[in-house]
Amino acid sequence: MATSKLQALWNHPAGPKTIHFWAPTFKWGISIANIADFQKPPETLSYPQQIVITGTGLVWSRYSTVITPKNWNLFSVSLGMAVTGIYQLTRKIKHDYVYEANSIVAKE
């Protein structure tokens, strides 16, 4: 039974014999790096980088569900990229607009 499931995975159109498996698998590195950046101070985050990570995640999440065969590996990594990008953008916006505004009011 396990052998037949492994054989089905191996021969799948988006299986390990194709770029459709390996590209999303290596794309996890971007999401992992973005998660590692959760520890960085928000002032070091880049708006353009996080906007691109979020946008890429959203676009490819949608694409991965409309292609045939559906590529769930691509969907999951893209969703992860979108979520981590949104989180980082939220941190950056809070730092730049909420905390900065509060510190200006406190100084006055």
UniProtKB/Swiss-Prot annotation:
Lipid bilayer topology: Multi-pass membrane protein
Q: Where found?
A: Mitochondrion; Mitochondrion inner membrane
Induction comment? By abscisic acid (ABA) and drought stress.
* Bilayer-crossing regions: 19-35, 51-67, 74-90
Family from the record: Belongs to the mitochondrial pyruvate carrier (MPC) (TC 2.A.105) family.
**Its biological purpose:** Mediates the uptake of pyruvate into mitochondria. Negatively regulates ABA-induced guard cell signaling and mediates drought stress responses.
Name of the protein this chain belongs to? Mitochondrial pyruvate carrier 3
Which organism encodes this protein?
A: Arabidopsis thaliana (Mouse-ear cress)
- Organism classification: Eukaryota, Viridiplantae, Streptophyta, Embryophyta, Tracheophyta
